[in-house]
């Protein structure tokens, strides 16, 4: 059945409206991405300085091994996973890649469905696990596009506290790391115990630069939980940046696809119009011939 010219015109108008919406959403996501990238860069400066300070305190000037439990691996009976997703869709494969990876981890390390807890930041992840019979221990929804530490302080602090109280024995953060506008990289990073402070990066002369007013262990008791919390917060900022990039790319793709559909419909409309005109001319000529 042939499609009428009016139907094609209606489809073109509808697709143009959709294109305008996705283009506007793309520009909004681009603005969000710029702010997120700046926040991520600023955090990296802070994180590097805190990491260097901790490394110097732990390993500099011939310091011996610390007995702080946040630095010591223990027998693993239960694992905690912080899974960071978005609250909604329209972000391409941003959520599916991380959720697929987490389920693969579960099948590999927890095939009996025991020995792990999920802490979900983002509604898509929480809903995904609930639909599969996995009840998140905690969940957080409705983060802003540039989440402040105050927004996530409660869930982060509670998670670190649970590790300290041995409710689980290791903690991983599963999220998408922002590489560039078109690329993100799925990461599963161990946050606790803290094992990635490289002794080779320590300053052997750090004690000449500053003097500790109290014992090293007392300082570490205060500093290590804060460091762990800040690293988790950094992963959240990074994931938000990747989310905004994914949203921008998805809307750009949608806009480009809409333009292609409009072009195809326009060609279809012109052909149908040409056929209609040809048909009218043929009928006029036939009518004139009949009158002769």
UniProtKB/Swiss-Prot annotation:
F-type ATPases have 2 components, CF(1) - the catalytic core - and CF(0) - the membrane proton channel. CF(1) has five subunits: alpha(3), beta(3), gamma(1), delta(1), epsilon(1). CF(0) has three main subunits: a, b and c. It is a peripheral membrane protein. InterPro entries: ATP_synth_F1_ATPase_gsu (IPR035968), ATP_synth_F1_gsu (IPR000131), ATP_synth_F1_gsu_CS (IPR023632). Produces ATP from ADP in the presence of a proton gradient across the membrane. The gamma chain is believed to be important in regulating ATPase activity and the flow of protons through the CF(0) complex. Keywords: ATP synthesis, Cell membrane, CF(1), Hydrogen ion transport, Ion transport, Membrane, Transport. This is ATP synthase gamma chain. The keyword Membrane applies. Belongs to the ATPase gamma chain family. Signal peptide: none annotated. GO terms for biological process: proton motive force-driven ATP synthesis; proton motive force-driven plasma membrane ATP synthesis.
């Amino acid at each position: 059945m042939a499609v009428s010219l009016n139907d094609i015109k209606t489809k073109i108008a509808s697709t143009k409206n959709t294109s305008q919406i996705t283009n506007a959403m793309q520009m909004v996501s681009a603005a969000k991405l710029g702010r997120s990238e700046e926040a991520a860069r600023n955090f990296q400066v802070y994180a590097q300085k805190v990491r260097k300070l901790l490394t110097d305190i732990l390993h500099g000037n011939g310091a011996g091994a610390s007995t702080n439990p946040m630095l010591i691996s223990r027998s693993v009976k239960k694992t905690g996973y912080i899974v960071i997703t978005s609250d909604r869709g329209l972000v391409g494969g941003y959520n599916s890649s991380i959720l697929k990876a987490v389920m693969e981890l579960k099948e590999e390390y927890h095939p009996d469905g025991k020995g792990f807890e999920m802490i979900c930041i983002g509604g898509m992840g929480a809903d995904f696990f609930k639909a599969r019979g996995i009840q998140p221990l905690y969940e957080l929804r409705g983060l802003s596009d540039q989440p402040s530490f105050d927004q996530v302080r409660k869930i982060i602090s509670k998670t670190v506290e649970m590790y300290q109280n041995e409710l689980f024995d290791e903690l991983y953060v599963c999220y998408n790391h922002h590489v560039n506008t078109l690329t993100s990289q799925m990461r599963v990073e161990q946050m606790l115990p803290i094992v990635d402070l490289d002794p080779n990066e320590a300053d052997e002369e750090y004690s000449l630069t500053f003097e500790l007013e109290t014992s090293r262990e007392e300082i570490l008791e205060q500093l290590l939980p804060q460091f762990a919390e800040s690293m988790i917060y950094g992963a959240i900022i990074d994931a938000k940046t990747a989310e905004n990039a994914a949203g921008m790319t998805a809307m750009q793709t949608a806009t480009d696809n809409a333009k292609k559909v409009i072009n195809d419909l326009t060609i279809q409309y012109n052909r149908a119009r040409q056929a209609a005109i040809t048909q009218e001319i043929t009928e006029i000529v036939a009518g004139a011939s009949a009158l002769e």
